[in-house]
Design a protein with these regions (language model features):
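A conserved alpha-helical element in kinase catalytic cores
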Residues: 120-140
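Extracytoplasmic low-complexity repetitive segments enriched in small/polar residues
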Residues: 2-5, 67, 82, 106-109, ...
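Short, glycine/acidic-rich beta->alpha junctions
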Residues: 31, 126-127, 140-144, 233-237
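Regulatory N- and C-terminal appendages and interdomain linkers associated
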Residues: 1-59
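Carboxylate/His-rich catalytic cores and anion/metal-binding grooves
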Residues: 34-36, 40-100, 144-195
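Loop/turn elements at helix/coil->beta-strand transitions in domains of secreted/extracellular proteins
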Residues: 5-6, 108-109, 139-143, 155, ...
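ATP-dependent phospho-/nucleotidyl transfer catalytic cores
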Residues: 88-110, 114-118, 123-124, 161-242
């Protein structure tokens, strides 16, 4: 019965999955551990509500050791591996699709509850979200953000950020690209495959490695890289400048 001006998300699963000695998120800091969690969402007016059973994994790097853990929620499939219908909700308010400025971002299959990352210790918790919002409208892909209140098994767990998660479905939700045609790579010391369809990763990495051995001050080599790897120069410029 408490009033709130921001959305509320409630997460429920067995106590052992949160705090157990074997696979509890608050005892074992391992990204590969996953559980099933019941998620309930209420907007600030209580006019919009949904619930879904979701896969949940820990996210983050250094921030994995903080009292609030980043939680990656994926409800694309049920516990039997069957595909779920997308959740239709205005979780990100008035945010529009990046690939279609006339359509609001409403169809969801995953998002993350973000603890603020590296700025958690400074007690701000929204530095990254502010940067993403400043980037919105440029040619760089950004993730939507909305603050929320979180409850774990009915216990108040503080302020979190609801964030889009870079994934195969992110590009499907924002740009209309079939997720089966998406391969997402991540740079953590080295480039590794992260999500999507790994059908051409070895060939892709081979092409990248070969190109990076060249001298890009040569106009012909630079243009060949743009044409063959299909990088859009304006997008790359915006990303690097920001």
């Amino acid at each position: 019965n408490n009033e709130t001006t921001i959305p509320v998300i409630s997460l429920s699963m067995p106590y052992e999955n949160w705090f157990g000695e074997e696979e509890g998120f608050y005892n074992k800091i391992r990204e590969e551990i996953s559980h099933r969690v019941h998620v309930e969402y209420f907007d600030s007016t209580y006019n919009e509500y949904f619930y879904v059973n979701s896969k949940v994994k820990l996210g983050g790097n250094w921030s994995l050791g903080y009292p609030q853990r980043t939680l990656n929620l994926n409800f694309n499939k049920d516990e039997n591996g069957n595909k779920n219908e997308k959740v239709k909700a205005h979780v990100f308010g008035e945010r529009m699709m990046l690939g279609n400025s006339n359509q609001r971002l409403t169809d969801l299959t995953r998002f993350r509850l973000h603890n603020g990352g590296n700025c958690f210790e400074e007690r701000t918790g929204f530095n990254d979200a502010i940067l993403q919002n400043l980037m919105y409208g440029t040619n760089a892909s950004t993730t939507a953000y909305r603050p929320c209140i979180a409850y774990l098994n009915g216990e108040y767990w503080g302020l979190y950020s609801i964030r889009e998660h870079y994934s195969d479905t992110y590009f499907e939700d924002n740009y209309g690209v079939d997720k089966d045609n998406v391969a997402l790579y991540e740079l953590k010391g080295k480039i590794t495959f992260d999500d999507g369809n790994d059908f051409e990763s070895k060939e892709f990495m081979k092409r990248i490695d070969n190109f990076l051995k060249n001298d890009f001050s040569n106009d012909q080599i630079y243009q060949s890289f743009i044409d063959k790897v299909l990088i859009e120069p304006e997008n790359a410029k915006h990303k690097m400048i920001i």
